Each structure stands twice: as structure tokens, then as C-alpha cells.
Amino acid sequence: MNSTMQALFVRYKNALTAAGFFALALAFRLWHLGTPKGFIFDEVYYAKNAHSLLLHGVELDNGKAEFIVHPPVGKWLIAMGIKIFGFNEFGWRFSSALVGSISIVLIYFVAQRLFNNYYLSCLTALLTLLDGLHLVHSRTALLDIFLMFFLLLSFYFILLSKHWLAGFTLGFALATKWTGIYYLAAFFAFMIYVDYRQEKAMENLTPIKSTLQNKFFIRSTQFILIPVVTYVTTWMGWFLTPNGWDRNHSKNPLLSLWYYHTQMWQFHTNLTDKHSYQSN
């Protein structure tokens, strides 16, 4: 078998394997997806927020004892399922099941890049497919499965040296949950370290300081500027309506958004109430 035929065979084998994992994962996640009935844990917030996004383009400030404390991207994804299947248990959980299933395929290809071994990649995907925590988050309308997907996709783009795309997906991760910022910082620091090691390996063929300064600027654009711009852009529905939380705090919408974010920050840093779902 010549190299061209071998490459084609590997490509088709990977495609068929990925399709098989996706079909199996989706079957596991869609089976009785509408059960249990009613809202599970924070579905009571996210499903309703997603429905509000679908109807009004923004999570409305309705004056009730409720505060929207997470960015909108994950809830927009939940809204897609509601748009297709209606405001019911299956509808608000569908996007989680779909994205969770796609993430199994993504994990397979990440493992291929890391191990370059078909069987290890299959084992990695299979273990994730059967993992209880992944399965539960793929069957509930919570934000964590979307956060995981965007972070994993960012890592995959880094493995492919598509750093600009990694920046965009990190922005979407941050716009799903703020905890994405820790991974953004880690990826940024990792790329700075990689650049430094590569320049050291060049044995001073070019001035290291000048080259590193240029690369630092590029990495800052890829892993700071692009994620921030992407993050702010995801709030477009909030910008385009007067009914969002704190939207009218200032005549300058950016100042209103900043104020809203300070309120969100205070909520997260001062939250001390206990609940029956928390871990020990």
C-alpha cells in the first residue's frame, strides 16, 4: 500500500470510528432524555433564561428575586434545543446531549494528536463516553458540558497550531462560565513557554529578545484580545435591548455592562448559602 492510499485508509478509518462513537454517545444521551420530569438542580434557572433569550434576545430583568450570574453562550445553546423541540424537558436538555456527544468525537481526535495510536484513542473516547459525570452533564440543561466542549476545542486547535481559532473558542468558553479564564491563562502561559523554548533551541540565529517580544504580542492578541472581543460580542442581545439586567445603569452601554459584571463578581465572591447538592 503506497503512502497516499495508506493516508486515505487512515482518514476513512478515523471518520468511521468517530461516527460510530458519536452515534453510540448520542443514543446513550437521548435515551429517555425527558426523564425525570421537571427541572433538575439549576435547570430551573438556565432553562428559563434560555427561553427568555429565545423570546426576547436577552434574559429579562423582571424585578423578581432572581439574578443572572453567568454569561449567555451556554444558555443560547440550550435555547436552540427549546427552539426545535419546545419548552419541555427534552427540549431544554437536547443541546447538552448533542454537544456532549460531539465532545466524545473531539476527545477521540485530541487523543489521536497526543498519542498517535488508534487503540489508545478509542479507549480514551470509550472511557469518556461511559463516564458517569460526563453522561449526567450531557443529559441536563446545565452549563458545564458547554464549557468543557469549548475548552477541549481550544486545546485541539492549539494541538493543530491554529492559535487564532483557539482564541475565539476560549472567548466562547469564557462567555459560558467565567471559570474558563483559568484555562485561558494556562494556555497563554503554556504558549509563551513553548515560544521561549523554541527560540532557545534556535541557538541565537536571531535576537531572542526581539523575537520573543514579537511573539508575545501575537500571543497576547490570540489569547487575550480575541477572547475578550469574542466575549463582549456574545452580549449583543443585552446591548440591543433596554430590558437586560442593569442595562440602563448608565447612558454608556459599556459602563452598564461593566457595572453588571461587578455585581456578578460580588455575587460569586460573597455566595455562602449552603444547599443539599453541594459536596462535602
Placement of each model-derived feature along the sequence:
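Membrane-integral, polyisoprenol-dependent glycosyltransferases
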Residues: 2-241
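Membrane-lumen/periplasm interface segments of specific transmembrane helices
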Residues: 216-280
